[in-house]
Amino acid sequence: SSTVRIHIHTNSPEQIFELVRQHGEIQQRKVEDMVHQHQEWIRSEKDRVGIVTDSTCDLPQEFLDRYNIRVIPLTLAMDKDEFVDKVTITPEEFNQRLSFSSSVRTSQPSPGAFQDAFAAALNEHDGLVSIHLSAAMSGTWQGAVAASRNSADRIRVLNSKLVSIGLGMVVLEAAKRAQKGATIDEVEEAARAAASRTRFYVGLDTLDYAVRGGRVSKGSGLL
């Protein structure tokens, strides 16, 4: 067997990973966001408070770029393959694989992923408000809290008690306030207020995928 190290600059990392998977096993992967690195040089002085969230927020990329929102991706495990959510697999590809994958799991970002994201964001901003999906659904919020302890005076971590576009609306409200020059206290309060008045309803055509992901028991899935 042989090992190959590949270094590529691309706007479509998920396509590169899919191509490489066709020729062998990926032992280690690393993806860096060059857009955010460039934005360090052009950010507004008003942008004192940065917004961080996770990849479940489901905001369109246009809004993430416009408001300089930093996203920490979760990991998706589909059968024997692992993907970095919305980085090495797109939502469209996820949906395609979902139809034939027998096992689908998500896992929270690693402690190192949180620490790296917070360190990079603190180079751009005086403080951060980090807003995440419901702590009842994932350990992501707890991971963010743990990673923020060494910079607790500069990082506020919020459990939105929401997910998907519900979380996205809270993140967007906080980002708008931050871009207007609000203080970290004001941005945090805006996020908490938005979360408290947001209600998120979901209708499912089938419980099959919820059962596969472990969110619903097999017994409940039969009802």
Give the positions of each predicted feature.
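Short glycine/proline-enriched coil/turn segments at helix->beta-strand junctions
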Residues: 22-25, 47, 123-126, 151-153
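N-terminal glycine-rich anion-binding loop in soluble enzyme alpha/beta folds
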Residues: 52-113
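Mixed-charge interfacial surface used for oligomerization/domain docking
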Residues: 1-3, 37-39, 44-48, 56-66, ...
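Gly/His-enriched, cation/cofactor- and phosphate-binding structural elements
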Residues: 1-42
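Short, hydrophobic/glycine-enriched beta-strand segments
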Residues: 49-54, 131
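Glycine-rich phosphate- or other oxyanion-binding loops that anchor nucleotides, phosphorylated ligands
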Residues: 99-143, 188, 195
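Short glycine-rich or small-residue beta-strand-to-loop segments that form or flank ligand, phosphate
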Residues: 5-7, 127-134, 156-159, 173
